[in-house]
């Protein structure tokens, strides 16, 4: 079961490396990462298969997970229009997406407060 963890880190050299090292040193695969922020602070999203192990490893490095949730990861073809096709299916099902990012190996990560509806929409 994949999880999206959010860690707030300072926007400074080495901050992302510290998070990545903490997770990988615990033997947890970091399958994707994306971050957005300001000049001072960044909200980092990481995709991990084992939330508890990643959270524990981050805590040992004095890094706190501010939000955590299960997400849907979809294997996709690397071609023009794939994101449009999938998000159209989700929209037609009436599911509101609040998170989308790209993971390794041609996969898309989707988040919604309606996780069951999202899974159903993507299975159609």
What residue ranges belong to the model's regions?
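A conserved regulatory-domain signal marking ACT and ACT-like small-molecule sensing domains
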Residues: 1-124
């Amino acid at each position: 079961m994949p999880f999206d963890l959010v860690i707030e880190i300072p926007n400074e050299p080495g901050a992302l490396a510290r998070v990545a090292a903490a997770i990988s040193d615990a033997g947890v695969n970091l399958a994707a990462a994306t971050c957005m922020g300001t000049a001072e602070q960044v909200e980092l999203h990481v995709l991990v298969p084992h939330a508890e192990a990643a959270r524990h490893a981050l805590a040992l490095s004095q890094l706190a997970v501010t939000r955590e949730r299960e997400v849907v990861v979809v294997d996709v073809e690397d071609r023009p229009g794939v994101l449009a096709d999938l998000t159209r299916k989700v929209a037609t099902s009436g599911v509101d997406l609040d998170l989308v990012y790209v993971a390794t190996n041609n996969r898309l990560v989707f988040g919604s407060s309606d996780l069951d509806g999202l899974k159903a929409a993507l299975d159609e």
